[in-house]
Amino acid sequence: MSIENLKAALPEYAKDLKLNLGSISRTTVLDEEQLWGTLLASAAATRNAQVLAEIGAEAADNLSAQAYQAALGAVSIMGMNNVFYRGRGFLEGQYDDLRAGLRMNIIANPGVDKANFELWSFAVSSVNGCSHCVVAHEHTLREAGVGREAVLEALKAAAIVCGVAQALTAAQTLAAVG
């Protein structure tokens, strides 16, 4: 199970994604923990079993057990937060004065470098389409000294993984009915 398996599974019309996936997996902009945590969290956020299984297996070889769990923790907490903050945003400030009342302890104590956890949360928030969370995590990353290039590289990784998941879902669905 690996990035190579995903590339091989992509249909011809997704050749750009195949090339982008190969490139992002060799990036030098992010360190190994940042890269594989971003790929793992983004894969989980796509909800595509094949993408998660392939990336998850390779991420296990490239991340410590603690970082692996933290990346999955980022996707879990963002699954809740992205819905809450995106939904509250739709309400045009009418509920901004009320306390969320949601437990989010993992954000304060992720078990890994906080900037890496923020990077993974940023990537997942991008996949999930929560502009409030994307902006908040980007601001926190920049305040922590994470460079613009690293932030953009994480965004690219999330976008590529999301595109791969969509291409595979389309190909599998059409193959099943065709």
From Swiss-Prot:
Name this polypeptide is given: Alkyl hydroperoxide reductase AhpD
Source organism, top-level taxon: Bacteria
Taxonomy of the source species: Bacteria, Bacillati, Actinomycetota, Actinomycetes, Mycobacteriales
Disulphides: C130-C133
Subunit (UniProt): Homotrimer.
A GO BP entry: cell redox homeostasis
Organism: Mycobacterium marinum (strain ATCC BAA-535 / M)
InterPro entries per record: AhpD, AhpD-like, AhpD_core, CMD-like
Family of this protein: Belongs to the AhpD family.
Function of the molecule: Antioxidant protein with alkyl hydroperoxidase activity. Required for the reduction of the AhpC active site cysteine residues and for the regeneration of the AhpC enzyme activity.
Catalysed conversion reaction: N(6)-[(R)-dihydrolipoyl]-L-lysyl-[lipoyl-carrier protein] + a hydroperoxide = N(6)-[(R)-lipoyl]-L-lysyl-[lipoyl-carrier protein] + an alcohol + H2O
Alphabetized UniProt keyword annotations: Antioxidant, Disulfide bond, Oxidoreductase, Peroxidase, Redox-active center
PANTHER family assigned: ALKYL HYDROPEROXIDE REDUCTASE AHPD
One MF term in the entry's GO annotations: hydroperoxide reductase activity
Active site annotation, chain numbering: C130 (proton donor), C133 (cysteine sulfenic acid (-soh) intermediate)
EC number: 1.11.1.28
